[in-house]
Structures are given as C-alpha cells and as structure tokens.
C-alpha cells in the first residue's frame, strides 16, 4: 500500500535484485541496459532511515493513519528482523524459523561467496551488510507434518517432543519440501524420512522434523563460517522461537547459545526503530535498539553430550542427502510429469 505520494525502495531490497550498483548506491545502468529494463520504471532508492514523504489523504482513508504522518523508507525483511533482534553490530547473528529459515550475519563489509549459495544485502547504513544463508522449508516442514494430525495442537506437540531423546530413535528428516537454497541451490530436491521402523510414532517423526530443519540451518552456518564469519551466540526469532524443544535442539546442533527476543514480531519492531531514527526520536539504530530491544531471561545453552550425538546424526543427514540426491530429483521430475506442479 502506498502511504505517501512517492514510490521508493531502500538499498537492502534494491541490492537483492542484482541490478543495483552497491559501490555507487544506485541502479546499475550497465545491467539495466543489458536486460533492456528502463531505469525510469524503477523506484528511487534511499537509506532505511530516510524520511520519504507524508501520509496522503487517500492513504489515511485506507489505513486510519493521520494525514501528514511522517513516512520513513524502511527496509527488507531480514534487515528489519536484524534490527528488531538487536543484531546490528559485526559479529552478531540471528537464526530465524518462519515458513522458511535464515541465518543472518551482520557485517561491516560485503561478503563475496564464489559458490553463490548465500545472499549478501546492503544493510541499514553504508557501514552495514547482511550475509544470509537460507533453507526453504523450516517452519513449513513442521506445519505440513502437523497438518497430517489435525487433532494435535502445537502445545501438545512441543510437550511430547520434549520427552523424546535426541536423535528421535534413529530417524533423519531431509526438509526439502520446496527444494533447497543454501547450500545446494536446487529446486528439484524433495523431502524424506530415513530410519523409520515399526515402533516409530508421530512424536518421534515430529522431533525428527525439528532436528532436520536444524541440520539444514547448520549447513547454512557452516557456509557462513567458511566465509570467515563468526559469532559467539545466535539470537532466535520467528515462530520457531516459540518452541522450547526446538530452541534446545538448535543450541545442541549448532553448539552455540541461543538468546530469544522478548518481542515475537522482530521485523515490526525493527521497522519501528528505523522510523524512530527517521523521525528524530533516536539518534541512531544502535540507540533505538538499546531503548527498545529486550530479551527473555532464559537462554538455551548447548549440551556437550547432545552436540556430540547430533554431530553423528548430522553426518548421517549429509550422507542421506548425497545418497538420495538423484532419487529426489527423479521424483520431482516424475511428479511434474503426472501433473503435480511444485
């Protein structure tokens, strides 16, 4: 919805198009010319905290906002998520489980990855960048699984999953329901369970789903670590941060402490902080984070014993992928041939 009389973008979203000159901070005329895209159809680009107009009468009637309210540019979802989580300085990182999942590192320079299996975006200022690894089906995997058992709510699921020992009784889940981004960049991968037996129950399967998503996010972390990025802890966000067993699974799989934001909608908080800077309420993003970002008291600390066990399961996870990659791709091909378009 257009709230002011200007159509704009910010540097983070613009940089995600691959048609943005990050050195000049403007659209790349060379790329646009090669693609035959007229520059005049693209929005003007400004910083995340830049005021770009005021609420028009039409927008006020549609939203209930007051006419003349200041409109600040804002930014891409992961940039706002990082601000709302307080991960705004180099060496800080977030792990997000929504429908998809992301690991995002705050950087003071653009990180080039010759393997092309991560994303690097402009950040909320010229001194900040985000490097991101992403898995396609994180919370989506658990939502899909739970939809098969409509009488089980998430509270019950979490309670029962917490009772199951790490490893889910020898199960491994490959969470490739929608293909995969980091590290495989392959739309033709498909999900599967490995290791089921007659004693396997739905709660073991559910825990295996959580563990499989965590293994996939560990792959994202390892790609970022190979690029020289490090962190001493992760700030958890998204719907996955509401699940205590899933948080503990992640801490054990990554061998890193997890801190949890007190606010569930971190991207919304990040947008509010950016607006506060643009409106002059805060002098900087850092000041806004100090004033507004809070964390829950409980941190999730990794268990050495569980991490060692999960390292074995993680190797099995990767071996299962290598052994079945061709099978998954063939299954996707046959599915499309029989009218299943995904």
Which residues does each predicted region cover?
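Active-site core segments that coordinate phosphate-bearing ligands/cofactors
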Residues: 1-9, 13-14, 18-36, 46, ...
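A conserved beta-strand/loop element that lines the FAD pocket in flavoprotein oxidoreductases
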Residues: 40-42
């Amino acid at each position: 919805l257009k709230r002011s009389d200007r159509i704009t973008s910010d540097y983070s979203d613009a940089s995600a198009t691959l048609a943005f000159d990050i050195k000049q901070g403007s659209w790349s005329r060379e790329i646009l010319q090669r693609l035959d895209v007229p520059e005049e159809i693209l929005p003007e680009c400004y910083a995340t905290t830049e005021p770009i107009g005021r609420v028009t009468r039409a927008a006020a009637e549609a939203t209930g906002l007051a006419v003349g309210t200041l409109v600040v540019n804002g930014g891409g979802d992961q940039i706002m998520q990082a601000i709302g989580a307080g991960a705004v300085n180099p060496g800080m990182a977030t792990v997000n489980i929504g429908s998809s999942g992301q690991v995002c590192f705050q950087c003071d320079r653009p990180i080039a990855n010759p393997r092309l299996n991560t994303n690097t975006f402009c950040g909320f200022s010229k001194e900040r960048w985000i490097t991101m690894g992403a898995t396609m089906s994180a919370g989506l995997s658990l939502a899909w699984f739970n939809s098969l058992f409509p009488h089980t709510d998430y509270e019950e699921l979490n309670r029962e999953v917490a009772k199951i020992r790490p490893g889910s009784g020898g199960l491994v889940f490959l969470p490739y329901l929608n293909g995969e981004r980091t590290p495989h960049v392959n739309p033709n991968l498909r999900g599967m369970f490995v290791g089921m037996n007659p004693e396997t129950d739905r709660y073991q399967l559910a825990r295996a789903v959580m563990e499989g998503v965590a293994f996939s996010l560990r792959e994202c972390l390892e790609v970022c670590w190979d690029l020289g990025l490090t962190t001493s802890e992760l700030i958890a966000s998204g719907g996955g941060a509401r699940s205590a067993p899933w948080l503990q699974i992640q801490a054990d799989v990554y061998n890193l402490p997890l801190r949890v934001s007190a606010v569930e909608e971190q991207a919304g908080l990040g947008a509010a902080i950016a607006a506060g800077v643009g409106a002059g309420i805060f002098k900087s993003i850092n000041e806004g984070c100090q004033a507004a970002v809070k964390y829950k008291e409980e941190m999730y600390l990794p268990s050495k014993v569980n991490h060692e066990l999960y390292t074995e399961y993680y190797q099995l996870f990767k071996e299962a992928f290598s052994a079945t990659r061709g099978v998954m791709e063939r299954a996707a091909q046959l599915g499309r041939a029989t009218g299943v378009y995904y």
